[in-house]
């Protein structure tokens, strides 16, 4: 039975993506080019490749990042935290210290923020794998 004719889950999906070396274009085409998180781009051009891992959803709302700071300690190795924002307008949700903790201490593969970040120059200079809206 081929991979494409049966349901696959979790670690098996990640293994297949790595083994077959799928590109971001192929993944986007498979997702119908929906732009899963529109306007979210890598801040480091060397991070245009696909990052693999389980995701951990986090939330920031009403211009507060309190819940994000509580959840930072729950991130596991190889996870990709995705931080969604609601009513945060032009406020940066996290910066270099929190990103470094998630990536270097907890072992996150990347960090995705559906919102703004601070310390952009440091994030770029340290080549941290961050996708954000600005």
Regions found by a protein language model. Name each.
Residues 2-134:
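Feature captures the catalytic cores and cofactor-binding loops of soluble hydro-lyases/lyases
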